[in-house]
């Protein structure tokens, strides 16, 4: 990474300059200064790490709070949460008893092992009409709702709301819950190491080539390092996607559309070797907040109806985005049903 090289070069130059500064004569250590300073540091450490001060002040470790609280405070908070305590009652024996209590039945595939496995985590996609009192002018998900043949579908509850997409990724790819982690922490930034058991590792053991793709900047949530630690063979981000089409803005302010995203998934599939097993994990970006953005390249085709009609323009934009996602997914399913 060129930025890392430049940063390292600047740091190295700074250290060289420091080494060339005139040296002052060393003086004897003044214990009168060291003792109170050490006591102050020890008291701060005890207060910060040994009490509930951080929680009481509602300071959470994340990339966003670094901008608000500064590097030193946020680093200290992350340091406090680097060690995660075991949940109460967590023992191998208890886990074994639970596995016996809830035995699983592995699925049997009539046609053997699938050649291609494609997983799509669609940003913020939800069916708002399941909520009481919410009606839309038309079905925003006609294709998804029409799927019955060769389909298993239902509703999923996420562990996050209004942000922290990376936690949903972490739970899916590792099978670990974030329920027992300190509030506000993001595993992608703090708790991922090379060699951790993941779905990616299982797929590679079965002979799959594993690809992660996300049509947004690679700087989000430490994804390049995480995907590498998870064992993905290849990773693709916004700049790697060809013929990008944006919604609600341009390349600077908008998001890559689901249709454009899926066309790139099709390209990745078509470029693989015949018979090669492919596991493709994709996180979309089209429906990311906020929902008061310009309607560039987005038609207003679905909106709130009933008692709420005309009251929430943000929901109208969200409904129209979901409608476009549904059409893009129909394109993807139609393509793979014919190959």
Residue ranges and their predicted role:
Residues 100-112, 119-122, 127-339:
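Solvent-exposed soluble domains appended to multi-pass membrane proteins
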């Amino acid at each position: 990474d060129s930025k890392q090289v430049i940063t390292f070069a600047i740091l190295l130059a700074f250290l060289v300059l420091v080494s060339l500064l005139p040296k002052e004569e060393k003086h004897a250590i003044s214990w009168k200064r060291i003792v109170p300073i050490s006591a102050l540091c020890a008291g701060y450490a005890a207060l910060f790490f040994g009490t509930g001060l951080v929680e009481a002040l509602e300071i959470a470790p994340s990339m966003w709070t670094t901008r608000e609280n500064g590097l030193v405070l946020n680093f200290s908070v992350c340091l406090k949460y680097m060690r995660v305590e075991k949940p109460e009652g967590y023992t191998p024996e208890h886990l074994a008893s639970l596995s016996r209590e809830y035995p699983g039945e592995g699925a049997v595939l009539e046609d053997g092992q699938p050649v291609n496995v494609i997983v799509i985590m669609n940003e913020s996609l939800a069916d708002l009409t399941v909520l009481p009192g919410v009606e839309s002018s038309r079905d925003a998900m006609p294709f998804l709702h029409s799927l019955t043949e060769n389909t298993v579908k239902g509703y999923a509850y996420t562990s996050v709301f209004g942000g922290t997409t990376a936690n949903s990724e972490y739970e899916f790819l590792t099978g670990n819950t974030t329920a027992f982690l300190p509030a506000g922490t993001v595993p992608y930034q703090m708790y991922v190491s090379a060699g951790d058991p993941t779905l990616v590792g299982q797929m590679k053991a079965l002979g799959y080539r594993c690809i992660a793709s996300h049509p947004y900047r690679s700087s989000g949530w430490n994804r390049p390092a995480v995907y590498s630690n998870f064992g993905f063979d290849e990773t693709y981000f916004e700049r790697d996607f060809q013929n990008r089409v944006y919604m609600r803005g341009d390349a600077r302010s908008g998001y890559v559309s689901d249709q454009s995203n899926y066309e790139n998934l099709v390209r990745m599939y078509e470029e693989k070797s015949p018979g090669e097993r492919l596991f493709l994990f994709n996180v979309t970006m089209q429906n990311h907040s906020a929902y008061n953005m310009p309607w560039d390249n987005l038609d207003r085709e679905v909106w709130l109806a009933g008692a709420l009609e005309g009251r929430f323009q943000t929901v109208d934009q969200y409904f129209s985005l979901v409608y476009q996602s549904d059409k893009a997914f129909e394109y993807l399913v139609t393509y793979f049903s014919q190959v």
